[in-house]
């Protein structure tokens, strides 16, 4: 039996969590960053609205503001990110015990032994995305393949909120 590997990437995770906890940020360009008043720091994460303006992770704050004058900078809240990451891990663990986290927002899962219970890899990926959206309020892109490299490639191919089989 060919292995079935999933890679889940929670889309714009830090910025998405910030928008959940501060609804006034929704629809605005948002970047999780250092302190803009201290005039130092970089963009740690951004949402799609900021990305559409050309803001990139790693940009100095002055550059992000230059590219996107309406951008809202928010400080990181790692306790919230950890909480949401843990909930996502618990969801993943309901489908397989072979979960390999990579940072707070990504992980690989070997669901080979779970397909007889939950359906093929695409069906499992779609269920995971649906549950993450419903239970966490964020979206995920999930790649499905026979190895980790191609599964990761799949999760990177279509964003946000997509399943890609390679």
Label every PLM stretch briefly.
Residues 1-166:
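Gly/Gly-Pro- and Ser/Thr-rich, intrinsically disordered tail segments characteristic of DNA damage-repair
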